[in-house]
A protein has these predicted regions:
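Cytochrome P450 substrate-recognition site 1
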Residues: 1-82, 115-116, 134-162
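Cytochrome P450 core scaffold surrounding the K-helix E-X-X-R motif
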Residues: 24-30, 34, 128, 327-341
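Cytochrome P450 heme-thiolate monooxygenase catalytic core
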Residues: 37-48, 81-243
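Cytochrome P450 heme-thiolate "Cys pocket" and heme-binding signature region
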Residues: 53, 229, 234, 273-277, ...
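Conserved, non-catalytic sequence blocks in retroelement Pol enzymes and Pol-derived host proteins
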Residues: 77-81, 175, 194-196, 273-280, ...
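Cytochrome P450 I-helix active-site segment
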Residues: 84, 88, 134-144, 198-205, ...
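Cytochrome P450 catalytic-core helices
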Residues: 114, 238-263
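Conserved cytochrome P450 K-helix/beta-meander segment immediately N-terminal to the heme-binding cysteine loop
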Residues: 306, 324-353
């Protein structure tokens, strides 16, 4: 669509889609506090009804920033180092299970693995899927619940009527979604009963008063359950998708695989996350995979503020919905030459100006304070 009609395409009465990295940066980064998320984010929340929130779903910018400040210390380099040991424990389990099998469904195993990791890091309790080899009921219910989440976005008034409709699958999805949050709340309640010494360092500890171990003002067990669910879904799905695509590309490209193996062979036996961060080709392979296969390729709608918006000589009135998607921007030929070609080397040994342009246009998980 953008190849045919240009950087800006009108896709509805008051909606436009943009494929320009410059327009994206202005809307999502420079003026992210002015270009607010649309009501779409309220309707895709996994709870029944539009009144629940989470860090990704907040439309209110100040509310989102307050929660972000509480969580920011948990993603500092020091905190990430603390997570390494716990991650390695889950990785050892993964490797042991994989060695016992002749054939491995990598995507399925990665999904099990990442859910176990995030469950442990967020609430101090792994789901144990890698060991059991079975999908946890929580995951089954949530996957089925997407039927309800989709309806919530398009036919919200129908949601309360689902229990009375003669559609078994839809009813199962509805009640499954309720079980998802009942389970999340049970996990959080168990988590809150733990000693603060155990809770410190977990992803959910940012919501707690360090002196009492209880939820800070503005949070409750229910809101923490919603946040925990958000961490689990985002952390497990996006990472497992990316890991699978990386392996797939290495299989398709033996030359890339060989060069990456050579770089990895220089690591010491007890390497750390810091050591990995200093491997330029590994970084390039990951970036190039995320560029071609962003795990969240969908549009991210924003609303033009009262001051309006002008781009490439065209004025957009207040209330206009502007959307952009990583998939399209990552294929902008003005930034990425031969954009459909998997070429990790494009990130290495390039002039600083060109590298800066690529980094600004690299948005696999969106960009700016709101994502």
């Amino acid at each position: 669509m953008h190849e045919k009609y240009g950087n800006v395409v009108r896709i509805g009465p008051n909606q436009v889609s943009v494929a320009s990295p410059e327009a994206f940066h202005h809307v999502f980064v420079t003026r992210c506090s002015s270009f607010l998320k649309t009501d779409f984010y309220a309707t895709i929340q996994p709870g029944i009804g539009p009144n629940y929130a989470g860090l990704f779903n907040y439309i209110n910018h100040k509310q989102a920033m307050a929660e972000r400040r509480d969580l920011q210390p948990l993603f500092s380099p020091g905190s990430l180092k603390h997570y390494e040991a716990r991650f390695d424990e889950q990785l050892d389990i993964l490797m042991e299970v994989a060695k016992q099998r002749e054939k491995v469904d990598l995507f399925g195993l990665f999904k099990f693995f990442m859910l176990d990791v995030i469950g442990d890091l967020a609430l101090n309790k792994s789901f144990g899927q890698v060991t059991s080899g079975k999908e946890h009921q929580y995951v089954i219910d949530f996957n089925n619940a997407f039927m309800v989440i989709g309806l919530q976005n398009t036919f919200a008034p129908i949601i309360p009527l689902i229990p009375y409709l003669p559609f078994k699958k839809l009813k199962n999805a509805y009640y499954g979604l309720q079980r998802v949050f009942s389970y999340s709340q049970e996990r959080v309640e168990d988590y809150l009963k733990q000693d603060m010494s155990k809770k410190q360092g977990s992803l959910m500890s940012g919501y707690l008063d360090p002196a009492t171990g209880e939820p800070k003002d503005g949070y409750s067990a229910w809101s923490i359950a919603l946040a925990g669910h958000g961490f689990i879904v985002a952390g497990s799905e996006a990472t497992s998708i990316t890991l699978t695509y990386i392996i797939w590309m290495l299989i398709k490209r033996p030359d890339v695989d060989q060069r990456l193996r050579q770089e990895l062979s220089r690591l010491s036996k007890n390497y750390s996350n810091t050591d990995l961060a200093n491997l330029p080709y590994l970084d390039a392979v990951i970036r190039e995979t995320l560029r071609i296969y962003p795990p969240a390729p969908a549009p991210m709608p924003r609303v033009v503020p009262k001051s309006g918006f002008e781009f490439e000589g065209v004025s957009y009135p207040p209330g206009t919905v502007i959307s952009a998607q990583p998939y399209t921007i990552h294929r902008h030929e003005g930034v990425f030459e031969d954009p459909d070609e998997f070429r990790p080397e494009r990130w290495l040994d390039v002039p600083s100006e060109k590298k800066d342009r690529m980094y600004r246009a690299f948005i696999p998980f969106s960009a700016g304070q709101r994502g």
